[in-house]
Amino acid sequence: YGGLPVSLAQFGTGQDIQPLKTVKNYENYLKRLNKLPVWIDQAITNMREGIKRGVVQPTPLIVSGLPAIKALTEADVEKSVFYLAIKSMPSTFSKAEQARLTAAYTQSIKSRLLPASIKLYTFLEQEYLPKTRASAGVSAIPDGAAWYKYLVRFHTTTGMTPEEIHALGLKEVARIRGEMAKIQAGYKFEGSLTDFLKWHDNEAQFRPFKTDQDVLDAYGVLNKTIAAKLPQLFGRAPKAPLEIRAEPELTRATASDHYSGPAADGSRPGVFYTVIEDPAKYRNTGMTTLFLHEGQPGHHYHTALQQELPLPKFRKFGWITAYGEGWALYAETLGREMGLYDDPNQYLGHLKDELLRAVRLVTDTGLHSKNWTREQTMQYMMDNEGVIESEARRATERYMAWPGQALAYK
């Protein structure tokens, strides 16, 4: 779930945390890129040590991640993801600087980045993948059970045991499904609640988009609607702007919708990234609650205001999962006060996200403390949330890769 080589390559868009507006920016980015081979060598050394100790990743995580690493091995320099920065070089640079930077990046790709990426891909595919484990949970590795208990405490800041959290999750799943059943009754839909949720997800009226830009434009309208209501609820708003972007293609297959904070010096906005695999299948019923969480007043208000306030650096830039996600969950509930859930379809979308968080309590603890399999976890999601297999797979693999983190959302 994420990784430095792919993230570093994405910086070449100039749209992320690496600015690419000046010649100095380009020189600094190239310095970062040139350090990647050293990092890869150390990562391979660490993974070989993990193989010796029996501390390895589950097989599906490596299988899912290999295509993104494979994309780094493009031999044609001008098609390489590491060449993105050159393709978008500002026209204000002198011809001499453009030529110098192009030559420097080309040489780095040929002599450093491409060989290192091939080395990493070859290692993962031929040496590491055969040693990965069939188990899904972290408790299967040496000292994994103790590690998971620590991660539970780290992410939740509570003293609750995995068993207690699992029981709470089951209780919450039942409660929220009860609320959903009331909405189902209004539709006069005959069938199980899970069947109703599947039907609702697949209704054409809730999938009105044809292009990625259609989705982004809809979020833009939603952003304006919410922004107009926020002064009624908050006396202070962030100075940093918020932008809405589609998740880059390189990471779209493994990413989740997320927020990236602004630069503390104001040089970069906060960004809400949404994953659009197929715009024709993108549902509009979950957009409101998702944007309240990831955008404003959720993560954007929290992160941007935290950086803008006169606080010590450890508080400006620190992140406590339970607090950050807890605030974003609270932000979702403000949709009621703003009248955004008056439409029963949008309210159902809100409940679906609330159900997702309750399901996470069950599935994360199931995976990492009850020896649930990947398939068992996916089936629980499909049975209770009505999600399709690909969505269940993406979520399950996220929890496999990030033990305990999903518990902070409730």
Feature roles, as predicted:
Residues Y1-K410:
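N-terminal maturation segment of proteins
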